[in-house]
């Protein structure tokens, strides 16, 4: 994953070669305009920024889109690695929590966070990355975010436990809508027509994905148990001649058994008492709704906190995982059953090694996703990365059908995935157009400021003043 013998995270030395005689010439010290808030918004929302140089990620890790090489064969490696890492992470998590009666989700997250901290610490000790040292002030400022992240990953694992991967992936898009309108209310963001159109497609795909459960609600509500004649009420009938009892034949027994099974299955998934039989209120959808709310809250809070702390990518990952360990440990002891019987139920002897290995591997996958994300942006561009993220939702959703055969391949499931995939493409296109418009506006204002400062004195160099900074 590195190029030659040089690590991706190692800073590269930048030299400026001056032409002969350049020392006697007046240098052009025009300073480019500072990035606007819209330019920095993608990074603050958890996505990539368009241009960023930092010793922690390599001096030339992330360059301007105009300096990026054209997407070709060399860019396939980071793109494929990013897609493979995200798909693997989802599939392994689904395998881990989908066991019969599994209820130790917080313990799984505790192990994953410990593995993540260990991997980052090893990379820092090996000199691959640089981390900010632990201090009480940063820990105190970041603790609310770590607690919120615990709820994000906990509710996400519970939703993934009860829902199939396709429905989970489709409903995860609704988080984007909450974040967008949260930015409108608190950060002065705006939603363009193209982005709004993508939101409508996201909602439509979610309705299609949940249509089977919605239909089940009306079907169960209209169920009526066939009447059983009094003569065979107890399952026995009496011979009118001898008076002897014999097993009665009920011609509606098959239909009754099917109705009872449907009612029992729907009631078993209810999380709210008093709504037995209504599959729409199953715990999977409740956990998914909570996950969307927690995820949006986490992203919006991080946008404020990251300005206060000045964290970089690896600092954020390290603090998130490190500070979440005591929170996960406390919540696991308070909420989950740590008895020997329950631990043996969740980690049976015949699957114990496989489950623990999968949990450790999924913790390492989180690090791999962060690395491949930066690699993909470095090798291509932030625009290409956003499109890859939208395209990647299709194989992630299809992975549930391939590995777990859930949901079955039906017109409804395929339509939901297709509409959700199209919604992601429209959203990525709309955000890219919005970013381009913001860049054009920034360049126009920069050129205007340069011409105004240069018009004061024809012999002076056009420069921006410090008051021109937007940050």
Curated annotation (Swiss-Prot):
What are the record keywords, sorted? Answer: Cytoplasmic vesicle, Endoplasmic reticulum, Glycoprotein, Golgi apparatus, Membrane, Sugar transport, Transmembrane, Transmembrane helix, Transport
Q: Which residues lie on this side of the membrane: Cytoplasmic?
A: 1-70, 123-139, 188-193, 301-315, 376-383, 430-471
Q: Where is this region: Disordered?
A: 1-52, 442-471
- Where exactly are the transmembrane stretches of this chain? 71-91, 102-122, 140-160, 167-187, 194-214, 280-300, 316-336, 355-375, 384-404, 409-429
Q: Which family does it belong to?
A: Belongs to the TPT transporter family. SLC35D subfamily.
Q: What does this protein do?
A: Involved in the import of GDP-mannose from the cytoplasm into the Golgi lumen.
| GO cellular component terms given for this protein | cytoplasmic vesicle membrane; endoplasmic reticulum membrane; Golgi apparatus; Golgi membrane
Tell me the organism: Mycosarcoma maydis (Corn smut fungus)
Quaternary data: Homooligomer.
Q: What is this protein called?
A: GDP-mannose transporter
Q: Which NCBIfam families match?
A: nst
Glyco sites are at: 164, 222
């Amino acid at each position: 994953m590195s190029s030659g013998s040089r690590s991706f995270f190692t800073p590269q030395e930048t030299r400026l070669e001056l032409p002969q005689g350049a020392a006697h010439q007046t240098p052009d010290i025009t300073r480019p305009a500072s990035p606007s808030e819209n330019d920095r918004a993608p990074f603050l929302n958890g996505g990539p920024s368009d241009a960023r140089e930092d010793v922690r990620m390599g001096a030339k890790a992330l360059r301007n889109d105009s300096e990026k090489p054209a997407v070709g064969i060399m860019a396939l490696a980071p793109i494929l690695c990013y897609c493979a890492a995200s798909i693997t992470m989802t599939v392994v998590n689904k395998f881990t929590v989908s066991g019969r009666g599994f209820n130790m989700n917080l313990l799984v997250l505790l192990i994953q966070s410990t593995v993540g901290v260990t991997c980052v610490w090893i990379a820092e000790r090996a000199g691959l990355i640089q981390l900010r040292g632990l201090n009480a002030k940063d820990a105190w400022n970041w603790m609310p975010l770590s607690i919120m992240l615990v709820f994000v990953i906990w509710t996400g694992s519970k939703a993934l436990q009860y829902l199939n991967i396709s429905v989970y992936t489709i409903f995860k898009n609704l988080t984007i809508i909450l974040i967008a309108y949260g930015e409108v209310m608190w950060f002065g963001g705006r939603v363009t027509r193209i982005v709004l159109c993508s939101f409508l497609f996201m909602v439509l795909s979610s309705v299609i994905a949940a249509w089977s459960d919605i239909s089940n609600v009306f079907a169960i509500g209209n169920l009526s148990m066939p009447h059983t004649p009094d003569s065979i009420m107890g399952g026995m009938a009496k011979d009118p001649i001898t008076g002897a009892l014999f097993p009665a034949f009920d011609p509606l027994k098959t239909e009754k058994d099917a109705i009872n099974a449907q009612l029992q299955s729907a009631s078993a998934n209810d999380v709210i008492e008093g709504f037995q039989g209504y599959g729409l209120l199953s715990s999977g959808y409740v956990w998914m709704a909570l996950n969307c709310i927690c995820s949006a809250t986490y992203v919006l809070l991080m946008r404020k906190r990251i300005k206060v702390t000045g964290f970089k990518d690896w600092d954020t990952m390290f603090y998130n995982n490190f500070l979440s360990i005591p929170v996960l440990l406390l919540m696991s002891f308070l909420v989950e059953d740590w008895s020997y019987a329950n631990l043996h139920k969740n980690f049976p002897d015949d699957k114990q090694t496989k489950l623990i290995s999968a949990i450790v591997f999924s913790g390492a996958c989180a690090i791999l996703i962060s690395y491949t994300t930066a690699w993909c942006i470095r090798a291509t561009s932030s625009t290409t990365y956003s499109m890859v993220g939208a395209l990647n939702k299709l194989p992630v959703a299809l992975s549930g059908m391939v590995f777990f055969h859930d949901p079955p391949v039906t017109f409804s499931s395929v339509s939901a995935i297709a509409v959700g995939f199209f919604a992601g493409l429209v959203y990525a296109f709309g955000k890219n157009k919005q970013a381009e418009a913001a860049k054009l506006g920034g360049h126009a204002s920069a050129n205007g400021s340069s011409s105004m400062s240069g018009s004061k004195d024809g012999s002076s160099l056009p420069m921006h003043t410090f008051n021109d900074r937007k940050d």
